[in-house]
């Protein structure tokens, strides 16, 4: 029994070690070398584990080779509106299709843009990495350039999405406050499902589906495969107007009559729950 307990202890220790190493490698892949090193050295007895010793040495070497990006004013910014999930419905000849063609991008186009940026050496940075407030000696506040350290040849870029409200004209053909199959082929709201940000989407048959139907979950999907496209966990910056609600939640007073008091109250509760649930773990900025 003693030997068996020791054996189980060794197995658990090895599993913990592997978990720490995987976490540290992920942090280093996103250029957060200090946190990667801290993850390794925070493991009890790391000095006696060759894999962890080597990982620490590798992270220190990568940190030493990183170069500070010289001029934050040259960092490009690319932005998108809500992405088109169903082109057949978006470009069906109605008066809205001209605007969609001019101002929107499809999911396929967005994914192609991400892949192109990645292949050209761009790395997504948080807008607060570019510059931040610094209190001056006289008590005033001044925005100063941030310190972004990347491997030679890598270039920072800021990504944002505008109007993340999923307006009625895009999703709700009968204006009853609920998305339907007569919509123009866009996601209808953001929500958390199974612990992940995802989108609700009503397809042409009227089925309510959940998945990567807009920028936020699509970007997460890409970063799952390419963690080195994100600088220290950076995501996109998203903006809302508040017109007809936010993130697809109809919380403006105009919808009290359309939805009824109970449904309207639930929509408001869902919206608050959505924003609060993810506030501590998301890098999206409003």
For the regions a language model picked out, list residue spans one by one.
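Single conserved hydrophobic/aromatic residue that forms the stacking wall/gate
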Residues: 1-12, 276, 284-286
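Metal-dependent polysaccharide deacetylase catalytic core of the NodB/CE4 family, i.e.
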Residues: 73-93, 137-143, 150-157, 164-286
């Amino acid at each position: 029994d003693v030997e068996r307990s020791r054996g189980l202890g060794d197995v658990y220790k090895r599993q913990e070690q592997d978990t720490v190493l995987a976490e540290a490698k992920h942090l280093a892949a996103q250029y957060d070398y200090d946190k990667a090193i801290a993850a390794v050295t925070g493991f009890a007895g790391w000095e006696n584990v060759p894999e962890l010793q080597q990982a620490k040495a590798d992270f220190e070497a990568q940190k030493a080779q990183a170069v500070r990006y010289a001029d934050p004013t040259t960092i490009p910014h690319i932005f998108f509106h809500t992405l088109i999930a169903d082109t057949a419905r978006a470009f069906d000849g109605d008066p809205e299709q001209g605007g969609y063609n001019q101002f929107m991008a499809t999911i396929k186009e967005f994914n192609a843009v991400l892949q192109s940026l990645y292949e050209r050496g761009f790395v997504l940075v948080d807008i607060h990495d570019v510059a931040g407030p610094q209190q001056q000696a006289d008590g005033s506040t001044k925005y100063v350039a941030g310190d972004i350290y990347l491997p030679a040849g890598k270039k920072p870029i800021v990504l944002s999405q505008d109007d993340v409200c999923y307006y009625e004209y895009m999703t709700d053909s009968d204006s009853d406050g609920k998305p339907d199959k007569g919509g123009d082929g866009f996601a209808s709201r953001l929500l958390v499902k199974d612990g992940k940000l995802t989108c609700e989407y009503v397809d042409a048959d009227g089925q309510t589906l959940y998945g990567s139907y807009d920028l936020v979950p699509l970007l997460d999907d890409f970063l799952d495969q390419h963690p080195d496209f994100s600088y220290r966990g950076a995501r996109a910056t998203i903006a809302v107007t508040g017109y007809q609600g936010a993130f697809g939640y109809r919380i403006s007073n105009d919808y009290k009559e359309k939805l009824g008091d109970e449904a309207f109250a639930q929509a408001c509760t869902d919206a608050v729950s959505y924003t609060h649930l993810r506030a501590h773990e998301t890098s999206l900025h409003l």
